[in-house]
A protein has these predicted regions:
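Mature, structured domains of secreted/extracytosolic soluble proteins
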Residues: 2-13, 21-174
Length: 174
């Protein structure tokens, strides 16, 4: 009888240790299980509405520039580019500095929601350039950017800022 009792204690101890080690190892988070936040770059690269802007960003090595903190991107969607007769090929045929300036003229270095934007000048990422925001005279709740564009989709949130989708590019391209 003593031999069976001795084996039973070891078996019970083994089961308890196995049970607790199973609990401990199953509760650890793996990096692959964690949902990573999307930056402005990630949103642009994954959203089919921004295929023209995506091509411009990728061709001009701007992915990292849009991963910095506290940005507001006024992003023209594909329809905005099409209605303005601007293609990614036209932008990418510019010098690299001009193409980068085209994108940077759509970005302010502050995270602004639509509700916090005021009628004023906001400096863009291009030194000496700004976006002028005014109200539409017929509808004071509608904001006009540089006298050209309206925000058509408000407050697309990203981990490092906000995207305001606009109906026209803020830069005239010839």
């Amino acid at each position: 009888m003593k031999k069976i009792n001795f084996i039973g204690r070891y078996a019970a101890f083994f089961l308890i240790v196995t049970f607790f080690s199973g609990i401990v190892t199953s509760c650890t988070e793996k990096d692959s299980d964690i949902v990573k936040p999307k930056t402005i770059t990630d949103v642009i690269l994954q959203n089919s509405e921004f295929s023209t802007l995506r091509e411009i960003i990728l061709a001009n090595d701007l992915s990292d520039a849009l991963r910095t903190e506290n940005l507001t991107l006024f992003a023209p969607n594909d329809a905005a580019f099409k209605n303005s007769n601007i293609t990614s090929a036209k932008i990418n045929s510019m010098t690299k500095d001009s193409a980068r300036a085209f994108v940077f003229k759509h970005i302010i270095g502050q995270n602004q929601t639509y509700e916090t934007l005021k009628t004023q000048k906001y400096s863009t990422l291009v030194k000496g350039d700004s976006i002028i925001i005014t109200n539409r005279t017929t509808d004071p709740t509608t904001l006009i950017l540089n006298g050209l564009a309206n925000v058509i989709t408000k407050n697309v949130n990203a981990d490092n800022g906000t995207i305001q989708v606009i109906n026209k590019p803020l830069v005239v391209v010839k």
